[in-house]
């Protein structure tokens, strides 16, 4: 079982996995699952390799049992995947590992255009920043494409994957989020990570944090579906989805190095978000605007640019 020590002033806080409070499935279902809440189903399991992989497989094999807003969460995830397929693992009960199945349709029941799907991971990251800030007093920011940061340190990551439909219907999407909740200095997978505990959050109750996130995600997702997945349309009474994300994104305006999946890199200034959620960068060498849809992005200091 994972253990860690958190130093606060002259005190050390010691944690073992079993001392961290567990998720409470019945409490969560009572407040979140229909007809009371917005979820179709909520499954809480002790351990898995990856909630994203599991939920995508369930949705592919028995789609009728996994409608829109089906949720899978785990106390321990042993083979989670991040950007560019990187793996990471945290001690049991120290984080939120949650995946949500989305089958996006507009209010008339028409599927959203698949080109809008690129926004869903950004939307989920936005929902997470909003729910965490409202509950804990910690003010996270977004880093393109899928990181949630506090003062440059990674608090959470979001990853989306398509689930093909064998009957010819549009694919579903599984959006997964991993939020570092009570990780200590000793638990951190990398030195550039952080957790709500380390940021002195007003609460580290994962039941409350999970409920807040899923309720906020549902609100934002429904607003996105109501405008047919148009991220530039007036959205939720407060600008567009793109505007809301841009306001919280620290990448914009930065000089960045983007390592592309197929090799090669682009160095330039991050200008804006494209209509599909990609990152528009002005190449430093050629002065050409390029839209990057997938990359490992590093924010450069002036001396590195």
Where are these regions (language model features)?
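N-terminal lobe of the biotin/lipoate ligase/transferase fold
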Residues: 6-134, 302-305
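Long, positively charged amphipathic alpha-helical accessory segments at protein N-termini or as interdomain linkers
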Residues: 7-21, 105-140, 150-305
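Active-site glycine-centered loops adjacent to acidic/histidine catalytic or metal-binding residues
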Residues: 80, 147, 178
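Alpha/beta catalytic cores of group-transfer enzymes, especially the acyltransferase/condensing modules
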Residues: 142-146
């Amino acid at each position: 079982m994972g253990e860690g020590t958190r130093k606060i002033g002259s005190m050390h806080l010691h944690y073992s996995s079993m001392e961290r409070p567990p998720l409470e499935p019945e409490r969560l279902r009572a407040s979140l699952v229909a007809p009371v809440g917005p979820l179709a189903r909520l499954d809480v399991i002790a351990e898995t390799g990856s909630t994203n992989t599991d939920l995508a497989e369930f949705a592919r094999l028995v789609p009728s049992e996994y409608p829109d807003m089906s949720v899978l969460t785990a106390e321990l995830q042993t083979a989670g995947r991040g950007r560019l397929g990187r793996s990471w693992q945290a001690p049991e009960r120290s984080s939120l590992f949650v995946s949500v199945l989305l089958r996006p349709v507009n209010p008339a029941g028409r599927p959203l255009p698949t080109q809008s799907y690129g926004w869903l991971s950004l939307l989920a990251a936005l929902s997470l920043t909003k729910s965490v800030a409202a509950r804990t007093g910690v003010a996270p920011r977004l880093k393109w494409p899928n990181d949630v940061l506090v003062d440059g340190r990674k608090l959470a990551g979001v990853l989306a994957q398509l689930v093909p439909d064998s009957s010819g219907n549009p694919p579903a999407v599984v959006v997964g989020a991993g939020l570092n909740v009570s990780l200590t200095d000793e638990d951190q997978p990398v030195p550039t990570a952080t957790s709500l505990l380390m940021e002195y959050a007003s609460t580290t109750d994962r039941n409350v944090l999970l409920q807040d996130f899923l309720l906020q995600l549902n609100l934002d997702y429904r607003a996105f579906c109501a405008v047919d997945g148009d991220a530039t349309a007036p959205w939720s009474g407060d600008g567009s989805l793109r505007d809301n994300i841009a306001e919280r994104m620290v990448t914009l305006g930065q000089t960045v190095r983007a390592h592309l999946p197929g090799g090669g890199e682009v160095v330039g200034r991050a200008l804006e978000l494209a209509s599909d959620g990609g990152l528009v960068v002005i190449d430093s060498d050629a002065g050409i605007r390029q839209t990057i849809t997938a990359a490992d992005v590093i924010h450069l200091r002036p001396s590195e640019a």
